C-alpha cells in the first residue's frame, strides 16, 4: 500500500489479533533490534535456563528441551560469527532469536515461550547485562585505585601546595592528594558492589505482570542464572528499572570524580603550573602550532561526564510518570545505559593509563608549595601553642604578618625576628621551625592527615582492601 502498511501482519509472534500489519513508520518507531541485539548472549542464556526448568517440571518434553538448547547454541555461534541476519520487522532481539529458532528446529521452538512474556524476558536480559557490566566496572575501578596507590607510595614525601578556591591554602603531599582520589573511587566501587547485591534477583517467571499458572520453579532458574533468589512481586518485577537507574547514578557520580581529576590534570599540565607531564600516549598535537601537547584524553573524560549525566536524567524522566506495570516507554532504557557504560569504561581506562604514565615534577610542586604564604596556619598554630594566644587573636596576628610579607615581597620565613616581634612581642626564634613547608607537612599527624607517616598508613590500609 502507498502508506507502507502491510496487508498481513509482519510479525507472526503476536499478529493473530490483527487484520493488517503495522505501517513502516510504526515498525521504525517500535523496533529496538538496532540496539538491543547487544543482549543476545543474555537472551540465549536466559532461554536455555527457562527451557531447562520447563523440562525439569514436565511442562515441555526433554526432547523438545534438547532441540531448543541445541538450536539456541547454534544461534549463539551464528551471531558471534557475524552470519546471523537481524530483521527490523521482528522488532527486537527476543523475536529475532525465536524466529531463527523456529527455522532451525520447527514447532519445538514455539514451546520455549511457555510461562514467559517478553516483559519478564527483557527484564532478565537487561538485568543480566547490567550485572555483568557492574562486575566489569568493579574490576576497572580496582585497577584505577591500584594506580593511585602506586603513585601515592612513590610520592608520600613529595611536597605540593594544597588548594581551596584553587588558591594556595596549606602544604600537603602529592601522595596525600592521590589518596583523596583513592577514597573517591573506593566509594564508587562500594556503590558498584552494593548495586550488584541489589539487583541479584531473577525476574524470569513473572511473565507479563501477574505470574503464571504453570508449575514453574523460579528458584531453579534464579540459581541457574547466578542470582541469589527470584524477585518477590511480579508486578514490580516487570515495571522495575531501578537497577538501570542505579547503574546510571553510579556512573554519573564516578564520572563526576573522573571529571574533577581530569580538570586537575588539564590545569597541572599547563606550563603555568607545570606539576606534571602527560605521556605522549595520552596527548595530541596541534595541526598548526608545532609546540602544542594537548591533554585531549583528560578533556574528553571531562566531556563524557556531561553525556553520562544526561543519560541519567533522560531515564529518570522516562520512568517518572509510568503507571504499573509495563509500558513501551521502558524500551528507551537501554540506549542510555549502553552508551553510559561504554563512556564510563573508556573514561576509567584512559584515566588509569594517564595516572600510571604521568611524570611528576617534584621540583615545581615544591617551589609552588612555598609560595602564597601556605605556612600561615602553622604560624597561627605556633602562637596558640607557644604564646598562649586564643586562635582568633593568633589568626589576626598572622594576618598582619602576611600583610607585611606581601608588602615586602617576601615569604613569611624571610621576615626577621625583629619584624615579627614588632607585630607581637611573644614571638621567638622558635617560630622559624614551623615556617618551612616540610615542617608544616610533617606536623599534620592527625588521623587522615598529610604527614608522610599518616599517608603511608592510609596506603597500607587500602593495600589490604584492594
From Swiss-Prot:
SUPFAM superfamilies: L-aspartase-like (SSF48557). GO terms for cellular component: cytosol. GO terms for molecular function: argininosuccinate lyase activity. It is an enzyme of class 4 (lyase). Pfam families: ASL_C2, Lyase_1. Pathway: Amino-acid biosynthesis; L-arginine biosynthesis; L-arginine from L-ornithine and carbamoyl phosphate: step 3/3. GO terms for biological process: arginine biosynthetic process via ornithine; L-arginine biosynthetic process. Keywords: Amino-acid biosynthesis, Arginine biosynthesis, Cytoplasm, Lyase. Its main location: cytoplasm. It catalyses: 2-(N(omega)-L-arginino)succinate = fumarate + L-arginine. It is found in: Cytoplasm. Its EC number is 4.3.2.1. Belongs to the lyase 1 family. Argininosuccinate lyase subfamily. This is Argininosuccinate lyase 1. It comes from Agrobacterium fabrum (strain C58 / ATCC 33970) (Agrobacterium tumefaciens (strain C58)). The gene is argH1.
Amino acid at each position: 500500500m502507498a502508506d507502507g502498511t502491510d496487508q498481513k501482519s509482519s510479525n507472526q509472534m503476536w499478529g493473530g489479533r490483527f487484520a493488517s500489519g503495522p505501517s513502516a513508520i510504526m515498525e521504525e518507531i517500535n523496533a529496538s533490534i538496532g540496539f538491543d541485539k547487544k543482549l543476545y548472549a543474555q537472551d540465549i542464556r536466559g532461554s536455555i535456563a527457562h527451557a531447562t526448568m520447563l523440562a525439569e517440571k514436565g511442562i515441555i518434553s526433554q526432547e523438545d528441551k534438547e532441540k531448543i538448547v541445541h538450536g539456541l547454541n547454534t544461534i549463539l555461534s551464528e551471531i558471534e560469527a557475524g552470519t546471523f541476519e537481524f530483521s527490523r520487522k521482528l522488532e527486537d532481539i527476543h523475536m529475532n532469536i525465536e524466529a531463527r529458532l523456529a527455522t532451525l528446529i520447527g514447532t519445538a521452538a514455539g514451546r520455549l515461550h511457555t510461562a514467559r512474556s517478553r516483559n519478564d524476558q527483557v527484564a532478565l536480559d537487561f538485568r543480566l547485562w547490567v550485572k555483568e557490566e557492574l562486575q566489569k566496572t568493579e574490576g576497572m575501578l580496582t585497577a584505577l585505585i591500584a594506580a593511585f596507590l602506586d603513585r601515592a607510595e612513590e610520592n608520600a614525601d613529595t611536597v605540593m601546595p594544597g588548594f581551596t578556591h584553587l588558591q594556595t591554602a596549606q602544604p600537603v603531599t602529592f601522595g596525600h592528594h592521590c589518596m583523596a582520589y583513592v577514597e573517591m573511587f573506593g566509594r564508587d566501587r562500594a556503590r558498584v558492589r552494593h548495586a550488584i547485591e541489589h539487583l541479584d534477583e531473577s525476574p524470569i517467571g513473572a511473565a507479563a505482570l501477574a505470574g503464571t499458572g504453570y508449575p514453574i520453579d523460579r528458584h531453579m532458574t534464579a540459581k541457574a542464572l547466578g542470582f541469589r533468589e527470584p524477585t518477590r512481586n511480579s508486578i514490580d518485577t516487570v515495571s522495575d528499572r531501578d537497577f538501570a537507574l542505579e547503574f546510571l547514578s553510579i556512573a554519573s557520580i564516578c564520572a563526576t570524580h573522573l571529571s574533577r581529576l581530569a580538570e586537575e590534570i588539564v590545569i597541572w599540565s599547563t606550563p603555568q603550573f607545570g606539576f606534571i607531564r602527560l605521556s605522549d600516549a595520552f596527548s595530541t598535537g596541534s595541526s598548526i602550532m608545532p609546540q602544542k601537547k594537548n591533554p585531549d584524553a583528560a578533556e574528553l573524560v571531562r566531556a563524557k561526564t556531561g553525556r553520562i549525566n544526561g543519560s541519567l536524567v533522560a531515564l529518570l524522566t522516562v520512568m517518572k510518570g509510568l503507571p504499573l506495570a509495563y509500558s513501551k516507554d521502558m524500551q528507551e532504557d537501554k540506549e542510555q545505559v549502553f552508551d553510559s557504560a561504554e563512556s564510563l569504561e573508556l573514561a576509567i581506562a584512559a584515566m588509569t593509563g594517564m595516572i600510571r604514565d604521568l611524570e611528576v615534577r617534584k621540583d615545581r610542586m615544591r617551589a609552588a608549595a612555598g609560595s602564597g604564604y601556605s605556612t600561615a596556619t602553622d604560624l597561627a598554630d605556633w602562637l596558640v601553642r607557644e604564646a598562649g594566644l586564643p586562635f582568633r587573636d593568633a589568626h589576626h596576628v598572622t594576618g598582619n604578618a602576611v600583610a607585611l610579607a606581601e608588602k615586602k615581597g617576601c615569604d613569611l620565613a624571610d621576615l626577621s625576628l625583629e619584624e615579627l616581634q614588632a607585630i607581637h612581642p611573644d614571638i621567638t626564634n622558635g617560630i622559624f621551625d614551623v615556617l618551612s613547608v616540610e615542617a608544616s607537612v610533617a606536623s599534620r599527624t592527625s588521623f587522615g592527615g598529610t604527614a608522610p607517616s599518616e599517608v603511608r598508613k592510609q596506603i597500607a590500609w587500602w593495600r589490604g582492601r584492594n
